Amino acid sequence: MKPDIHPVYRTVVFHDTSANEYVKVGSTIKTEREIELGGVTYPYVTIDVSSKSHPFYTGRQKTFDSESSAARFQKRFGHFIGAKRG
């Protein structure tokens, strides 16, 4: 490896603001902010969504209608297809 070209890999605390959860992860992200957890100071980054708050991971998913787009089109505009102009 060449010296002085690789980013510094360190433990960083990511704060999921929507779930108010803190996650310690190894990262090369640059940040000026710091936070103290358990008597140790870590670099600190806020995020809006993580696995602690994303609906896919929490099980609070929206269910979508299984009706096809063609069927929805027919339902909305099907009466125009057979209509006479004039």
UniProtKB/Swiss-Prot annotation:
InterPro entries per the record?
Ribosomal_bL28/bL31-like_sf (IPR034704), Ribosomal_bL31 (IPR002150), Ribosomal_bL31_B (IPR027493), Ribosomal_bL31_sf (IPR042105)
UniProt keyword tRNA processing, yes or no: no
Signal peptide feature range: none
**Keywords associated with the record:** Ribonucleoprotein, Ribosomal protein
Q: Name one GO molecular function term.
A: structural constituent of ribosome
**Mind telling me which SUPFAM superfamilies this protein's record contains?**
L28p-like (SSF143800)
> What GO cellular component term, any one, is given?
ribonucleoprotein complex
A GO term (biological process) for this protein? translation
- Read off the Pfam families from this record: Ribosomal_L31
- Cite the record's note on assembly: Part of the 50S ribosomal subunit.
Give the similarity note. Belongs to the bacterial ribosomal protein bL31 family. Type B subfamily.
User: What is the protein name given in its UniProt record?
Assistant: Large ribosomal subunit protein bL31B
Q: Which gene encodes it?
A: rpmE2
